[in-house]
């Protein structure tokens, strides 16, 4: 092959690599799971403290957790989702509650 053809092929490779690098990050749902022991007020507190929901939305999500077994608190990139779930789980443990926050890839 000639030098011009190699140069074009090289530019196509770079373009393909750039397109692969420009993919949006994977997103994860942060899910609050129901248990039989954590007080409803504590769940509302968690939703307000870690997810910045107002009292009405936090109460609605708490009821979703209670009646449906779980609720999505938000959708974030992996690092943010992992941090939020870890913060919630540590906070619940600190206060002696078995509340569990998990992640699911979207």
Swiss-Prot record:
Function: Involved in the modulation of the specificity of the ClpAP-mediated ATP-dependent protein degradation.
InterPro entries from the UniProt entry: ClpS (IPR022935), ClpS_core (IPR003769), Ribosomal_bL12_C/ClpS-like (IPR014719)
SUBUNIT field: Binds to the N-terminal domain of the chaperone ClpA.
Name of protein: ATP-dependent Clp protease adapter protein ClpS
Pfam families named among the record's database cross-references: ClpS
PANTHER family: ATP-DEPENDENT CLP PROTEASE ADAPTER PROTEIN CLPS, ATP-DEPENDENT CLP PROTEASE ADAPTER PROTEIN CLPS1, CHLOROPLASTIC
Family, similarity comment: Belongs to the ClpS family.
Composition bias, Basic and acidic residues: 9-20
A GO biological-process term: proteolysis
Tree of life domain: Bacteria
Region (Disordered): 1-22
